[in-house]
């Protein structure tokens, strides 16, 4: 997702609940989009009303996070990302990320 200018949005109430539940601030979660090694997949299971994506990558603070978000292209090199949730990556997700970055 590099080479793209991102604008970020989220629901402040959802961000507060996420911080309390998972200990991850959406301001940290948005930096995952800047990780050139981040992996992003389409979230088929949760995309009934809107297209949702799941990204696993390192935040600017070094945390490996899983971020659920929407992604809407707004121009040739710009996008709006709405963060839905964020949490620390599980052991399995960490292994997938590390395998993907070592290839």
Where do the language-model regions lie?
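Ribonuclease/tRNase effector modules and their secretory precursors
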Residues: 1-103
